[in-house]
């Protein structure tokens, strides 16, 4: 049985989560909602972020008759989940940095977390570290510039390896053996990050784990064939470039629609 899944992010980083879900559960209908107007979320005030997310997500749930919501954004997940779960009767899944598997994989017990400044400073992140990586030295690296580099890449623009090298230099100096990509945008730059850091550092993200969690909550069997009436739509706020629009079209979205800041369709 096909279910309706709403995936939400500030930008196109959540496409990395969406891809993992479509790979594991291709029989479901996917609606990708991204708040491009307020990108990047890692720099927003907490109450601004919470109110903005809730105002967008609640009407979209009703419109697409969602059976489950996935907040495919680390910055939003650390703040918005309680408000959404209090308002909804359907499951809400958030993305958290892969601290636990990183601590388990590390041979040196010296790991890094690369995320937005907002995620880095949140109490939730530090609770994760204390709970699952208390036996590790954890280096924290916050960057909003990497979010914009990922957005630029998705829009068809080249990624400056020189600029990326400069941004990642603090990580190189620490000699961590596992690096958590704690923002859903960052897997978009996996190849470029590996070019800078080398193959000796393991890069971890949460995509596969989120897909498995959605499978559990929907009690879905893994399928390898699309349903005849398979649906994939995208919705966005703000203005997006021609390159980004082209990327969305290559992802198989049947409809790509613009919304107002409070989730209303712009005719």
Describe each PLM feature range.
Residues 1-267:
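Non-catalytic structural scaffold of enzyme domains
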């Amino acid at each position: 049985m096909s279910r309706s899944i709403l995936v939400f992010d500030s930008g196109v980083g959540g496409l990395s989560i969406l891809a993992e879900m479509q790979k594991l559960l291709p029989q479901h209908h996917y609606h990708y909602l991204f708040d491009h107007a307020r990108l990047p979320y890692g720099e927003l005030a907490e109450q601004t972020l919470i109110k903005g997310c809730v105002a967008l997500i609640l009407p979209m749930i009703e419109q697409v008759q969602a059976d489950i919501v996935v907040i495919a954004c680390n910055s939003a997940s650390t703040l918005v989940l309680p408000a959404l779960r209090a308002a909804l009767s359907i499951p809400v899944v958030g993305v958290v940095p892969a601290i636990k598997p990183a601590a388990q994989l590390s041979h040196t017990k010296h790991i890094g977390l690369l995320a937005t400044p907002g995620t880095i400073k949140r109490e939730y992140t530090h609770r994760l570290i204390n709970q699952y990586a208390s036996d590790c030295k954890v280096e924290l690296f916050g960057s909003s510039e990497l979010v914009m580099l990922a957005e630029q890449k998705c829009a068809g623009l080249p990624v400056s390896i020189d600029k990326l090298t400069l941004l990642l230099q603090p990580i190189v100096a620490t000699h961590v053996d596992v690096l958590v990509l704690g923002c859903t945008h960052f897997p978009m730059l996996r190849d470029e990050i590996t070019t800078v850091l080398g193959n000796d550092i393991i890069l971890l993200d949460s995509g596969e784990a989120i897909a498995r969690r959605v499978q559990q909550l929907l009690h879905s069997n893994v399928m390898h064939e699309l349903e005849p009436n398979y649906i994939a739509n995208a919705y966005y706020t703000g203005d997006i470039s021609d390159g980004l629009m082209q990327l969305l079209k290559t992802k198989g979205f049947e409809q790509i629609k613009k919304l107002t800041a409070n989730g209303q369709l712009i005719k």
